[in-house]
Amino acid sequence: MAKSYSNKSLWIVILFFCVFSGCEVRELSSSNESDAEVLSERKIRASSEKQNSHVYIGTGSVQGVYFPIGGVICRLLNRKTYIHRIRCTLESTGGSVYNLRQLREDNFDIVFAQSDWQFNAYEGISTFEKDKPNPNLRAVFALEADPLALIVRQDSEIESFDDLQNRVVSFGYARALQNRIIDDLLKVKKWTSKNFKQIKRINDNQQISEVCSSNVDAVLLLSSSLNDHLKDLDEGCKLKFIAIEGAEVDELVKSKPYYRKSYFSKGEFLDSPKKVSSFGLGATFVAQESTSPKVIYHVVKEVVENFNDFKSLHPSLKKLNKKELPFAGISVPLHPGAIRYYEEIGLLK
């Protein structure tokens, strides 16, 4: 039976753990108080509690993945407050772009950011063009990957990405994230729309039904969305993943370090008989260079020393590889506090 997970139920469990281990949770943008008021209150709170250092983590929406993972990190850190005198507070936010801007303004100590937004903020490009580059952005560690899911019917003759030539495909609607990612790969492969019989622009919530109905030969989704799109899969529709791998993927990941390789495990989401390779973006944990090296050191230390527990508390963390923490999807320099710990345990030399 293919595996699937409910993010909603999982964050409730993580929140339960967080509350009973003493980590604080705060939600921004409530109807009663502005973000500025919340951030101001937080600074007052921190200055009034002299005995502990405080670390404030910006996550994402309560229904998303970053929030429960942030809860796990705070839980691990707060279990040892009596030793390192660091207290962790978790806050829900609007996501990567908001987090990176607030981090630069010193309103957070560490934030979650999608790997491409991390790169864009550091370089001052795309959405961050008006913000200008942030040369002081530093990486703490890599988190879960979000690989592309290329899906075809189980009886399809398509066995590789190159088999998509002269086929009807959908890479999602025009502004879909997976569409932007696959465009980068097509440029490396020197493919254009002429390599396909037709490229349809189908909304993500319709893609699975379209491939099941044979209206398209293949569809492309993000692994992070598969639970939602496969939960009502008709029993008569058998699907499989197609690997996205090879020299062109290697070249792309090397030239654009915010991309990373990943895979779908045997039986993950679909009844795949074997592991299927892919690539995509990922989540990263980042700070400013000015963030306390002591805080960053202990954050990394608690995650690594409790790595199996950390991975077990959210399905998206299951495939994390300790050796990839300083590297996967990381396109900015590592924070000195993280470097210190990675060197101590031999992950960096």
For each feature predicted by the language model, list its residue ranges:
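An extracytoplasmic/periplasmic, membrane-proximal ligand-sensing/linker region
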Residues: 206, 213-214, 223-241, 252-254, ...
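Bilobed "Venus flytrap"/periplasmic-binding protein-like clamshell domains
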Residues: 52-80, 86, 146-213, 308, ...
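Acidic, polar ligand-binding/catalytic clefts
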Residues: 105-145, 224-228
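Bacterial N-terminal signal peptides that target proteins for export
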Residues: 2-11
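Immediate post-signal peptide segment of exported/extracytoplasmic ligand-binding proteins
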Residues: 28-58, 158-168, 336, 343-344, ...
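Bacterial signal peptide processing site
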Residues: 24-26
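Pocket-lining segment of extracytoplasmic ligand-binding domains
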Residues: 115-117, 125-127, 156, 193-286, ...
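N-terminal (or domain-start) structured segment
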Residues: 44-114, 120
